[in-house]
Every structure is written in C-alpha cells, then in structure tokens.
Amino acid sequence: MRLWIALVALLVVGCVDSSTAAVRHETTIPSIVTSPTVTIPATTAAAMPMPPPTVAAQTLQDDQPPSIGAEPLQKMHVQRAFPNLSFKRMVDMAYPDDGSNRLFVLLQPGVIVAFANDRNVEAAEVFLDIRERVSDRGNEEGLLGLAFDPDFRANSYFYVYYSAANPRLSVLSRFTAHTAGSVANADSERVILEIEQPYSNHNGGQIAFGPDGYLYVGLGDGGSRGDPKGNGQNLSTLLGSILRIAVGTLDESGSYSIPADNPFVGSEGARGEIWAYGIRNPWRFSFDRESGELWMPDVGQNRFEEVNIVRRGLNYGWNVMEGSECFEPSRGCDTQGLEMPITEYGREGGCSVTGGYVYRGKRLPSLYGAYVYGDFCSGKIWALRHDGTKITEHLEIVDSKLEISSFGEDQNGEIFVLSFDGGIYRLVVGGR
C-alpha cells in the first residue's frame, strides 16, 4: 500500500544462499488484554463511526458447497463482524488449522492479538508483542505478515515478516507458541531470512503456505518512485518477487532450503528462491483453497492497480509495464515475455489495491468461486470469476467508506474485511 495524505498506508538442491542472524532483542509478553477494545500506543489513524453491529448468516440446506456461477454476483454491504472488538492499524488476519476456530490479527506496530471467531466475543488476548524489534518509522514498514505452520497443531510454529531498522531490513522469522493453544514465546525467534531494503516503502510482507507445503513470500521492489534500482526486472535480487522456500527442515542456524523445481534454480546470476518476478508491491496474495491458484494484486505507481494469477517463472512486467500499458517510456516498450494482469483499474476505482480471497464459504452462495478484492483509498470491493482463460463475471459489490487494509479468512472459508481504522467487517447480502 502507499502513504495517502497523512495516513499510514500500507502498502535448493545444492548451496543455499540465505541470510541468518541472531535475535536482536528480547521482550516479554504483556498481560492478557481483557478489555473489549485492544488499543496499541502511538496510533496515528483516527477511528471513524461504525454502522450498527447487525450480522446474520445465510446458510445452505446441506453440507455441500455451492456450484460456481449457480447464482450471479450481486451487490452487498458490510457490517461489523465483532462489534465488541476494535483494533488500530490492522494490516492482516490469519488462522491456524488447529480446530480452535481462533482468529489472529496483526497490528502494524508489532503486536498480534487473538480472539475466538464468535460474533459475541468480548475480549482479545495479546498473542505476540515484538514492538521492540519492529520498525514502523516508514509508513509502509512494520509487522506485515503472519503464517501458521501447516503442522501448527503438533509443532506450534508460526512465521512472521516484519521491518527492522539500523540497518533497514525485512525480516522473516519463525516463532513458537508455548503450546499450540497458548500465547507465543517471544524469546523463541529464529531468523530465517533478512533482506536489505533501500527505501522505506514497497515492503510487500505477505507470507503464506501453498498447497505444496512451501512458504511463499511477497517482496516489493524496494521502494521509491518508478523502481530506480531496477529491482523488478533483476533476478539477482530477491526484491520485486514472490519467493518460494522450504522451511520444514530448518537447521540450527535457521537456514531454509530451495525447492529443486523452482524456476531459476541453476540459472546463472539468478536467485533460486524466486518463483515469479516483475512485481512492484504485492499487497496481500492468497491461494484458492480449492484450485490452489495463487492470486496476487500489485499496487501501481500513478495509473493502474492490477490483479494477477501467479504462475511459475512468469515476469509480471514491472517496471517495464504498469498494468497492461508501458510505464516509462509510456509507449513502445518491449512486452515480449511479460505476463499481463487479468484485470486492472485506474484512479476512478481508487489508488491502492488490496488483495483478498477466492470465496469458498457457505454463507454467500452468489459469491462462491469468485475472487474478492478491494481498494484502500476508495473503500470499493469487487468480485470476479475467471475460467482460467478470461473473466466471466466482474462486479463492484460494495462501495464503502472503509480503509481496506486487508481481507481475512476463517477456517470455513468465510471472508472478513479489515479496515485500518479499527473495525472488522463481513460481507452481507440485503438485510440479512
């Protein structure tokens, strides 16, 4: 994401070339928060009035998922999902596959809070507090990504991506919860990867395990205007790329391994971790839990916000292209070998795309199989269906006043909308 006015925006087989480091600081977990509202100090965003907390679920008559396209996309609105909870500077949501039905929310200054996925929940607890290690001095820096190990129930591992200072770095680390159902041990950090950042913006930050069990990491181009260092088209740097690494067998130093089928393994001068490249700032990618497809938005420079389906080894064009048009120069660029977005929009739709999920829940049959995404600046939310070749349906489903910093998903595939100002919302059809 990007700074907009004064608001924080977000937005191998063989030798392994990875960076490791010791834990920089130690910190203790504060007391569990018992008040209905969890507020982290030094908040810069002001809360906005929230609509009445009314939510009702639309359910199916049986346990079978809806059929894709059985109902056309339709207009919706948003309502508070957890009216007793409010958080400042929310940037992501995740859940562990441990049967606990808990949700975990990332707060940009460096805190993760956890709570029951229950509309009537009254309190959240602090799961991890690493504010002493996290730098959020740059408007797009901070604690930006969380992924639970696929075997979290057994090993209690989870992974975070955050910004550090002096020097300016993006850090990927593994932590351990005391037990899978408890708070995290802040002293358990094992740094996996540190990436030097030339500027304070375009940090990416999304991390997620794919259906193949590997960890995918989203990195922006390193920042500033127009990718001045050319990182997007440079395979010798990890910046401007989606990485794919194996973290299941970390050695004592924290070193990961690179899957042998990564596209640039063995290519001279290329980093083997790279899965796809030519990316400006991928703010919130996700895997379709049914098809396994990787959906990724890319925040644009001045003209276009775009959505892509990421595939092995492809070049998504930045900084030759912005969206489907030449960047600088604005015409005559060589587009050979570049992958075009499946959709894009200009400034009439907003200014900073936020990626969501392919909906696989049961509450909203008309949305089943559609990719849901939004815009931080305009508060608009769209849904689209894609048949593997082309878009078959595309609709603006919500026009809100929210600052959409992220989307979330629970264990049942239901989608939440996170507004940076403090509210968590769900999508609702009509008055239901």
Where are these regions (language model features)?
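Extracellular mucin-like PTS domains
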Residues: V23-T54
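Beta-propeller blade signature
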Residues: L172-A180, N231-V247, V310-R311
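Conserved blade-ending motifs and adjacent loop-strand segments that build the rim/top face
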Residues: I279, K390-Q411
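Surface-exposed loop and turn segments in beta-propeller and other repeat-based domains
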Residues: F82, E125-N139, D187-G204, L238, ...
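C-terminal motif of bacterial Sec signal peptides marking the signal peptidase cleavage site
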Residues: V12-G14
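Bacterial signal peptide processing site
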Residues: V16-S18
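Acidic, Gly/Ser/Thr-rich repeat motifs that build Ca2+-stabilized beta-propeller blades
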Residues: M48-G226, R284-F287, G292-G300, G349-D387, ...
